[in-house]
Amino acid sequence: MDSLITAAAQALAAGDPLGALKRVALRDDAPALALRGIAMAQLGDFVRAKALLKSAARAFGPREAVARARCVVAEAEIALVSRDLGWPEKALDAAQAVLQAHGDRINAAHARNLQVRRLLLIGRLDEADQRLAGLDPSALPAAARTAHDLVVAGLAIRRLQTRAAREALMRAYDAARQAGIPALIAEVQGAALALQATAGRLVALGTERPLLLDQVEVLFASDTLVIDACRHAVRHRGSVVSLATRPVLFTLARALGEAWPGDVPRDALVAIAFRGKHADESHRARLRVEIGRLRVELTPLAEVTATKRGFALTPRGAQEIVVLAPPLDERHGDVLALLADGEAWSSSALAIALGASARTVQRALEQLAAAGKIAGFGRGRSRRWTTPSVPGFPTSLLLPGPLPSD
């Protein structure tokens, strides 16, 4: 490897893409194309970066498997950052295997981190845990350790393990400072803000108050029956009844939970669950059917009883019932929560992350755009959607993916 290529690679490793480009901008050999692609990615020009990396992968000879694998990893990272979640996973898996087999532990670990970050983004937490298992980051350079601990922190946050998340973020910050890359330090600091953001609202006895993530963790461990409107579930300590695919049942459970220890009139439940302005006999019959289904689903945790004017919810083992609501109740809040990260998402990537159909997501995007809450740019397959981050807006911390759609 010649001196200019070495110097450009060192500049990229130090977070200096302009310094790298000064050395290789006019060269078209395979190593230079790869370095130019990575530099353009660091500068945010993802379209040009992908084109350069594809050219580099083609330019490397058949005996340069490691170099081609590194190009694949770089392409995968660009796809992740640009929210192209449809990028082929198998290509990254194959590249990771090649790098591992040839002793390139640093880039193999980076490939695994990308795999985990994608799984984390689309809510497949168990698979993300499995990918991380057995990876020892201690021998990795500081920048790679930072990336690893950011992933560990992200998993811990999604699992409401705030102590583990703080410890991972502290390790990530120390490693980022050791690496001396300002952008990496800023990324860690941004991730740490999640622990200080409002994660939900506690609704009980006619009042509500905001909760931080560690307070949500304490709530889930307490002797309280929680109607979880963030994950569409009913939980008491370690027992969880998911209603994520039963939106009508969850709507009824939430209404009964908010009214506890009182009851909810039948006509009010019809209006809430079925959006009917006037309850006729067919509505009441449907309500009886849905209440019967809810009663069966909640048998381990609570009892749904009939009262003179409606229905009430009574916990079986818990002391009280509360509702954990998102920071802001917003139509299509799951879509807005993902867009709140400030990145530009395609509708197909949103559908993958939410486990919803493309048609459902497209309809939600059109309604949000009509309301002026998001903006779209580009045409056809290149169309992307984004929104400014709104203070107090529901984060994706509590989103399990998939959630029920209309």
Regions found by a protein language model. Give the residues of each.
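Short boundary/linker motifs that mark transitions into or out of structured domains
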Residues: I185-F250, R254, V296-G333, A337
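Residue register of alpha-helical TPR repeats
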Residues: D2, P31, I38, R70, ...
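"A position-specific structural signal for the A-helix of alpha-solenoid helical repeats
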Residues: T6, L35, A67, A74, ...
